[in-house]
Design a protein with these regions (language model features):
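Helix-loop module immediately N-terminal to the HCX5R catalytic loop
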Residues: 43-73, 187-220
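Flexible, polar/low-complexity N-terminal or interdomain linker segments that lie immediately upstream
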Residues: 1-27, 103-178, 264-272
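Thiolate-centered catalytic microenvironments shared by cysteine-dependent enzyme domains
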Residues: 53-148, 165-166, 181, 229-252
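Short cysteine clusters
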Residues: 224
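Extended hydrophobic/aromatic segments used for targeting, binding, or gating
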Residues: 244-272
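N-terminal, Lys/Arg-enriched amphipathic/low-complexity engagement segments
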Residues: 39-41
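A mid-sequence, solvent-exposed acidic-amphipathic segment
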Residues: 153, 157-210
């Protein structure tokens, strides 16, 4: 669920607030919501392979953050709150269903002049037990390639990335891939079109209009560059609009754009 700034302020003592950061040095340590603990988004990843953490590692990460299995976790993040949605998708797969996202994130909190804290939170370690992940909401590239004609693909990157003008957004300009363009058949729905100017998610009615071209029985796959932006689209479709068959291709363009022999489409010519 999405919770408002006001709701969180009135319930700070009853929830576990977690800031999921891409770059903690310029976000969490410059000011965070009082009581919020920090988790670097990379802590959700495996130490030995390009995959997600084992249940044992995730248990340690959440336990070190003082989180218990029955806690209501309220997530927010830097980078326009996108990593809060990504963490929601991951934590739900590992069996933590008592989750919420702060609608509008830290930027709306700051704009509305709610208090912030600059000190790291002293955490009392807990004994968290993560479940074996249920990856029914995930699709790997091998299945994706075998089902291209059966699925509805949504590319949630910017139009420039989708068209093939660039392989990464400005904030990640050093992280390029070998190919530009998009997966054949994908429709471009930039993730930012789902947000209001204050970075809150648009209403259910507005989201319904954006995705009015979809059918309820469509098998939908969303992707972006690394999975974070696509998780916002996944959340809107699955958790807000109630589409049942929505999966996230978290390998996204950093995997697909570097693969040999896979089909790629561009909206522009390489010689234009």
């Amino acid at each position: 669920m999405l919770v408002s700034i006001e709701w969180l302020y009135n319930n700070l003592k009853d929830v576990k607030v977690v800031e999921i950061d891409y770059n903690p040095q310029i976000s969490y340590y410059e000011g965070h919501i009082p009581g919020a603990v920090l988790i670097n988004w990379r802590d959700f990843l495996s130490d030995n392979s390009r995959d997600f953490a084992s249940p044992e590692k995730l248990s340690k990460v959440l336990g070190n953050a003082g989180i218990n299995n029955d806690d209501l976790i309220v997530l927010y993040s830097d980078m326009n709150n996108r990593y809060a949605f990504y963490a929601y998708w991951i934590l739900k797969a590992y069996g933590h269903s008592n989750l919420a996202i702060l609608n509008g994130g830290i930027y709306k909190w700051l704009r509305e002049n709610y208090p912030i804290d600059n000190d790291a939170v002293v955490v009392r370690r807990s004994e968290y037990k993560a479940s074996k992940p249920d990856w029914s909401s995930r699709i790997l590239v091998w299945e994706l390639l075998s089902r291209l004609k059966e699925i509805v693909l949504i590319d949630s990157r910017s139009k420039e990335e989708y068209d093939g003008l660039t392989t990464a957004p400005p904030e990640h300009k050093c992280e390029q891939t070998q190919m530009s363009g998009h997966i054949p058949g994908a429709k471009n729905v930039p993730w930012t079109t789902l947000l209001n100017d204050d970075e809150t998610m648009k209403s259910r009615d507005e989201l319904g209009r954006i995705f009015s071209w979809l059918n309820r029985e469509d098998r939908i796959v969303v992707y972006c560059r690394t999975g974070a932006r696509a998780s916002v689209v996944w959340y809107a479709l699955k958790e807000v609009l109630g589409f049942r068959l929505v999966r996230l291709y978290d390998g996204s363009w950093v995997e697909y754009g570097n693969m040999v022999g896979v089909p790629v489409e561009k909206s522009i010519s390489d010689h234009s």
